[in-house]
Regions:
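Catalytic or ion-coupling anion/metal-binding cores of large enzyme and transporter domains
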Residues: 1-52, 57-78, 83-84, 89-94, ...
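A short, small-residue-rich loop immediately preceding and capping a beta-strand
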Residues: 109-130, 142-145
Length: 557
């Protein structure tokens, strides 16, 4: 198998002189045309701290590839910032950006005949977007995570600011104190520092086998992260030499490894959505029920924010996630024979990993975990016939029954919470925020943080057909499918209806007689204003159910 399977069609022979001429214009030499071409997809942007340093890393990757027997070509794709747009109309574009990233990477690499691909990402949607693009292309590929931000000197971060906003609304802190926390909490480059969505997905990708061992926990600004980038050239050259493609690595068993890691680390509900979409892109049959099946046997062992006490940078100082993976492998909770981007199996990568220092308090033992089974619960019932995803650690209890307070947008719900209209025992329902309904399936960090900040985290439940930030904690259920926009049962809820959430029986039940629900369904009117043009209109037309990953290129859904 030639190492230049794709680029040879672009640059070889007299008839490709014009193509070569263009490439000479960007600095190619005659020798470069004899090498495999490797695209380096950078998500650099100054719109967010998560990505402001990515081009520095991309240039190290570019140099490392050029120093191997390959030729790097650096290009950019987009990023948006969930943290900046949270709670606004702009958040409707967040999940959409996952598809734009995947589409743009696929477009550039497919158009320009690259033999391999290295993608570097920071903010939440960069990771699944890059992996979806890699899966579609199915050429030797490697992902590099941009790394975590360090917490402030007071151990605060972005999520702290969100929750302090709730405390301010309640009257517990002054505006001056809120601004003080705002000013100190996000300093410099890197992704949000807890086990929020970015770190969850970076960890999942390492467990999946698509990034180099140890890379998911590194600080954004560190020698370790630079070293990770310097290793990329040798790694991608080896992958091209072996013709080791994403389809060889991203198997059903590898996805089960990723799910196991996400659960053990107490990861974000967004991992469910993104892993389903990544599996769909590579042709792996992954379902919500796989998360339930695996979750019954995998405990939560990481005491990491949002519901724990530590940050990813602290875990990195103890050895990152590799010792966690080794713990899981030793208990036969991982498939050790899965291939990885090193060309070795997961078990071979972990063979010489030492256990954590016994004095560290971040990772608990499998025998004495934080929670004995998964915090990610897949719920079904008359409110979620196609499923819903709950994030329940047990700190807030495992069952909740209360009266519905119904809102048809995030803004309406958030305002009611800030106005102190939500009381203990309520079930906040925010609907018409699903993939089609938003459109865009916004994250509900602002309202859930306001609930936590007002001291109602264990007294109020929150359900939505939208989704949650990785920073969300409390009694929350999202991804309710079918969504309100397509007439799902969540559209039928009225104020004061009783709702029962049971994370033990995995049920989400609307306690209203079926005859009444059928009458409501007959009288249901679509209240949503649909976009007529632009990316949101295209997305609404194409996107499928959250229960299948909210993908945009499966036309038989």
């Amino acid at each position: 198998m030639t190492k230049r399977k794709h680029s040879s069609k672009l640059v070889d022979g007299p008839l490709q002189a014009a193509s070569r001429s263009m490439l000479r214009g960007v600095g190619f030499s005659s020798e470069d045309f004899k090498k495999p071409l490797v695209g380096v997809a950078s998500t650099w942007s100054k719109v967010t701290p998560c990505n402001m340093h990515i081009n520095d890393l991309a240039e190290i990757v570019e140099q490392s590839i050029d120093e191997s027997n390959c030729k790097a070509v650096l290009f950019n794709t987009i990023t948006v910032s969930d943290g900046i747009s949270m709670g606004t109309e702009g958040m409707k574009y967040s999940l959409v950006s996952r598809e734009v990233i995947a589409d743009s990477i696929e477009t550039v690499v497919g158009c320009l005949g690259y033999d391999g691909l290295v993608a570097i990402g920071g903010c939440d949607k960069n990771m699944p977007g890059a992996l979806i693009g890699m899966a579609r292309l199915n050429r030797p590929s490697l992902f590099i995570y941009g790394g975590s931000i360090k917490p402030s000197h007071e151990n605060t971060d972005y999520v702290t600011v969100c929750e302090k906003t709730g405390e301010y609304a309640k009257g517990d802190i002054s505006e001056d104190e809120l601004i003080r926390i705002e000013e100190i909490s996000v300093k410099g480059p890197g992704s949000c520092g807890g086990m929020y969505t970015a770190n969850t997905m970076a960890s999942a990708i390492e467990a999946l086998g698509m990034s180099l061992p140890g890379s998911s926990s590194q600080d954004a600004i560190s020698n370790n992260k630079k070293h990770d980038c310097k290793e990329a050239g040798t790694a991608i050259e080896h992958l091209i030499e072996l013709d080791l493609k994403p389809s060889d690595i991203m198997t059903k068993e590898a996805f089960e490894n990723a799910i196991t890691a996400v659960i053990a680390l107490g990861g974000s509900t967004n991992a469910v959505l993104h892993l389903l979409a990544m599996a769909d892109a590579i042709g792996v049959d992954l379902h919500l029920d796989d998360f339930s099946r695996i979750g019954e046997n995998v405990p939560v062992v990481a005491d990491i924010k949002p519901f724990g006490n530590h940050f990813m940078s602290e875990l990195n100082e103890q050895g990152g996630i590799s010792p966690v993976l080794k713990m899981l492998l030793d208990k036969n909770l991982l498939h050790g024979d899965c291939l990885t981007v090193t060309g070795k199996t997961l078990a071979e990568n972990l063979e010489n990993i030492s256990p954590y220092n016994s004095s560290q308090g971040i990772i608990k033992s499998l025998e004495d975990p934080i929670k004995g089974s998964s915090h990610l619960r897949i719920l079904y019932g008359n409110l979620a016939p196609e499923g819903a995803v709950a994030k329940i650690t047990g700190q807030e209890g495992t069952t909740f029954e209360g009266k519905a307070r119904v809102f048809n947008s995030e803004e309406d719900g958030n305002q009611a919470i800030l106005n102190k209209e939500i009381k203990a025992g309520d079930v906040v329902v925010i609907r018409y925020e699903g993939p089609k309904g938003g459109p865009g399936m916004r994250e509900m960090l602002k309202p859930t943080s306001a609930i936590m900040g007002q001291g109602l985290g264990d007294k109020v439940a929150f359900i939505t057909d939208g989704r949650f930030s990785g920073g969300t904690h409390g009694f929350v259920v999202g991804h309710i499918s079918p969504e309100a926009e397509v007439g799902g049962p969540i559209a039928l809820i009225e104020d004061d209806d009783l709702i029962r959430i049971d994370a033990e029986s995995n049920e989400l039940i609307l306690l209203v007689d079926e005859e009444i629900l059928q009458e409501r369904k007959r009288n249901l009117k679509n209240i949503n204003m649909s976009p007529k043009k632009g990316v949101l209109a295209k997305y609404k037309h194409l996107v499928g159910s959250a229960s299948k990953g909210a993908v945009t290129d499966s036309y038989d859904q």
